[in-house]
Amino acid sequence: MWFLTTLLLWVPVDGQVDTTKAVITLQPPWVSVFQEETVTLHCEVLHLPGSSSTQWFLNGTATQTSTPSYRITSASVNDSGEYRCQRGLSGRSDPIQLEIHRGWLLLQVSSRVFMEGEPLALRCHAWKDKLVYNVLYYRNGKAFKFFHWNSNLTILKTNISHNGTYHCSGMGKHRYTSAGISQYTVKGLQLPTPVWFHVLFYLAVGIMFLVNTVLWVTIRKELKRKKKWNLEISLDSGHEKKVISSLQEDRHLEEELKCQEQKEEQLQEGVHRKEPQGAT
């Protein structure tokens, strides 16, 4: 029973956040920014185990920054890349791909991959926050939203149909189109594996372990019993041989005694025959 209890304690509950894994958040919350802009990455852990020292990685290489916040001032193209972080004994975070752009207009988003049902916020951002009007948002080359004055666009609940390539355009002194074209992916919901499945799985493993143990013990006892039985047969066989040998010896002695008695009788008869002759 203790074995099954231990197995049940190992059962993971799907749908819960891994509280020991670091998570990167951005301020402002966009993964694409213009050159010379400032962006700060924060390394956060819900339940931080052990030491709170922080390590940052850019394109797989450890950086010299050891604080929970990684601040980039006056961003340049060299700051583009894949960022990860780790705090103390936490697991390393999922990567954040930061892009630094040049141009007059930029379509910004907080992530490039979303789970179905999550909100998607888009921002058509002008260089140095210049005023832009008659803003159009495009998906897969087709305009789908118009704002007379620049405004952020929020899709409250994303679904698979929102997958595609996005960009924006707007008017300033001239007609501008966003620098770079961003591909955004909406992943379908993955149904969590029910807890009962894990319980049944570990229960089956426990039963298999128990059955194997019982079989092993049974086979071991059977082997010991057979070994003892063979030994007893061997001993009995040896005893029978000794008894037979003893009987054979007794028979041989009896035969010798009979022969001896017969010889004595013959001698006595010979003596009796000689006595009458002497008397005559």
From Swiss-Prot:
Residues 220-280 are cytoplasmic. Induction: Up-regulated by IFNG/IFN-gamma. The keyword Transmembrane helix applies. Disulfide bonds join 43-85, 124-168. Residues 1-15 form the signal peptide. Its main location: membrane. The keyword Transit peptide does not apply. One of its GO terms (molecular function) is IgG receptor activity. Pfam families: Ig_2 (PF13895), Ig_3 (PF13927). Residues 258-280 are annotated as: Disordered. It is a single-pass type I membrane protein. Belongs to the immunoglobulin superfamily. FCGR1 family. May bind to the Fc region of immunoglobulins gamma with a low affinity compared to FCGR1A. May function in the humoral immune response. This is Putative high affinity immunoglobulin gamma Fc receptor IB. It comes from Homo sapiens.
